[in-house]
Amino acid sequence: MQHRGKYEFRRGIGKFGGKYQQAKGPADRLYGKNLSKVQRILILDFGSQFTQLIARRVREMGVYSEILPANTPLQEIESHRPSGLILSGGPHSVFDPGSPQSDPKVLDLGIPVLGICYGMQWIGRALGGKVEPAATREYGFTRVRVSKPNSPLFKGFPGAETNTWMSHGDEVRELPEGFVESARSHSSSLAAMENPERRIFAVQFHPEVTHTERGIEIFRNFLQICGVHGGWNLGDYATHKQKE
C-alpha cells in the first residue's frame, strides 16, 4: 500500500537504449528498423504515483523502459521480449476488492523481476507467502539493514544500514518457498526478499525516490542482473524526430 503524500518528484526523461526486438508500441515508432537492437525493461504499473519516476531511473542509465498496465495479458508482455520486469508500488492493499493484479505467470518467464512496495506484497501473495496488515504503518524515512551479504541486488553495501522511504500498510510476514530475507527495517519488518535461483527480487521501500539514499545503486544492480547495457540517449531521439 502506498500513501499519496504531499511530496512531489520531478518527472522527466533521461537516457534509454539497447538490444532486443520488440512487438508494438512507442519504441517501434521510435527505432524503426533498428528496433531489433533495443534492450528493454518493462514496468508493470499497479497505480503508483512514482511509476514514471521508475521509468526515468532506468532510462537515466541508458536503458529503454516501457510502462504497461499491471493487467496486461501475458502474451503481450512476452511479445515485448523484455530483459527484465519491474512491478511498481500502488495505493491499494492487496486485500482490497478490485486491487490491481497481474497474471502470476509473469513470474515464470525466466527473466529477472524486481517488485517495489505493493509489487513485493503481490509477489509474496502470488507465490504462497503470507501477507498481512502491518501492526504499525510505515511511512517516511526508515532505516534498513542489509542482512544478506551476497545479495546481487545489494551489491556494494552488504551489512550496511541505509535510509529508505517507506509507505505501506501491509507486509510480507512469511516468505514464499525458495525466498530468503535480504534486508530488514529497524521496526523488524521485512524490507527485502529474493529468490536468487529464479532471479526474483523485491523491496518494501521505494528505491526510485531521492529520499532513499542508495536507490540508484539498487536499480544499477538490477540492470546488471538483467544483463542490459546502455547506449541510446535523448539526443538520438531528438535527431530522429527532426528527420521525420
Predicted regions, residues:
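Short, intrinsically disordered, low-complexity terminal segments
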Residues: Y20, K24, G156-F157
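Gly/Ala-rich beta-loop-alpha elbow adjacent to hydrolase catalytic centers
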Residues: G115, G119, G124
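RNA-binding accessory domains that recognize and position tRNA/RNA substrates
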Residues: K33-G84, S93, Q101, L107-L109, ...
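Short, low-complexity intrinsically disordered segments enriched in A/P/G/S/L with frequent Arg
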Residues: P26-Y31
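Conserved pre-ATP/AMP-binding loop-to-beta segment of ANL
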Residues: G110-L114
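Cationic, low-complexity basic patches in intrinsically disordered or flexible, solvent-exposed regions
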Residues: H3, Y7-F9, F16, Y20-Q22
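Structural motif
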Residues: I86-S88
